[in-house]
């Protein structure tokens, strides 16, 4: 199953205002989870103790939070996948279910390789030495510890833009939430794309 596939090396896209930028609006001082054309991992809690979806700054200037249904679709599920009949007190389990779920494409690949493991490909081998950085991949079978030069992606899949998932279910942040985030980022002194805070200040507002 392992080392039977090798996709193209992933190139990290540049974070600028021409692309959707996902971030944790509940954070700001120590890190905001910048994600280009996507959202950072879903978290049930936050530094503010608020269970909430991350936010996306779109190239048109809109600052929006995806709905639960959108996050289900981002994971490859149908909208409503987390619908539950039992009422739960306090925080509902839906966000945790979506955040902890293995995405559908990954599960499909794992299942396909469990069913049909495939043959090990010919990889460049590198020695693993003590007190040296470990390689990204390797094994310890027969000849001892061996590193291999392998891609961090077993297969190459064209990922859709998060803009394709944007619909009327997305919600705007309140003035208070947006202003609070801007202030925390200013205080934290984090490295952010040029014009990011200015774009947030110019965004349409939703009073709370």
Predicted regions and their residues:
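Class I S-adenosyl-L-methionine
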Residues: 1-65, 71-72, 199-201, 205-207
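Rossmann-like AdoMet/SAM-dependent catalytic core
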Residues: 38, 45, 67-75, 93-94, ...
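Active-site-adjacent bridging/hinge elements
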Residues: 75-88
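A helicase ATPase "motif cassette" and its flanking acidic/Ser/Thr-rich regulatory loops
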Residues: 103
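Acidic-aromatic/histidine active-site loop/patch
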Residues: 107
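Short, hydrophobic alpha-helical segments
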Residues: 111-122
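Acidic, Ser/Thr-rich low-complexity intrinsically disordered segments
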Residues: 124-204
